[in-house]
Amino acid sequence: MSRTALIENITAMLEDADFLVSDRCAVRPKSFDVAARRDEDLVLLKILGNVDALDAETGAEMRRLGEYLQATPMVIGIRTRDEELKPGVVYFRHGVPVINPDTGYDLFVEGMPPLIYAAPGGLYVSLDGDLLADEREERGWSLGRLATELGVSRRTVSKYEDGMNASIEVAIQLEDLFNEPFSSPVDVLDGAGEVRDADPTPSAPETDPDDEHVLHVLTNAGFTVHPTARAPFKAVSEDEGSSPARVLTGHSTFTPAAEKRARIMSSIGEVARTRSVYFTEENEDRESVDGTALVSCEELADISDPEGIRELIRDRAKAPSEA
């Protein structure tokens, strides 16, 4: 299956699951293919045949954007270089959760999150340690008795009851012994932080020198500006005094390629519940494109009042619907 067909299939699946899905980010640079929202769950999805194609820089950008937009970065893919991704298992690449399409269907359509995650050494599950302790005590078993049944040490059983994760083999043994599942679902839509072994969110990239003057003006106007490296927009700007607070921010000469980015920003903004603004090097005869505000750098330079800048963006940029 081609990557384009895979993206179309995943998009259709999400729409069937009542997600609002953005237009595909068919521009470069980019770190994700589509944004999708259902209620308060916002996902930034990268869709790949081979998930090993996700490099460290893209993974870092996805995690930063997830933090800026209050979204979950996620990869849906088919295989690694060595094997097919297993259904019902969460993998990780550069701190980003990775699942296959079958797992995605179970999660998004059926509402069944995966129970298993991959980590160095094999496949693991999160155990409900309190439930395990209750069941063991109700049966009148000591730590030693359960340790003998499992073929592990008393210390290991004690750690399981304190919340240590277990191999899938141990989880199956426990279920067979007690006729009770002890596995806790992996909260993929919250980033799987409880099982993800990753560094803190990577620091922001350096601002492109070509964009410094625009982002500097926004900073002086009271925005908190987060530069991006691999997105259809140059920054995510936050204005805590507005609703919505976040503004997808672009800047360049307004070429046909830039107009395409502006339209994609509008689509992403509708899903992510942000406004979007594109700062142009020349004056344009339009004030917006598909809801993305167009503001020339000359106009920006003529406004000395920070509130005037915020008002201009609010007036020209379409506010996203809450649907």
Curated annotation (Swiss-Prot):
Keywords recorded for this protein, A-Z: DNA-binding, Transcription, Transcription regulation
CDD domains: HTH_XRE
DNA-binding region: 143-162
Chain coiled-coil ranges: none
Any one GO molecular-function label of the UniProt entry: DNA-binding transcription factor activity
Recorded superkingdom: Archaea
Domain HTH cro/C1-type: 132-189
HAMAP family: HTH_type_cro_C1
Protein name: Putative HTH-type transcriptional regulatory protein Hlac_0273
Pfam families: HTH_3
NCBIfam families: PRK04140.1
Chain segments carrying region Disordered: 188-211
Secretion signal, residue range per the UniProt entry: none
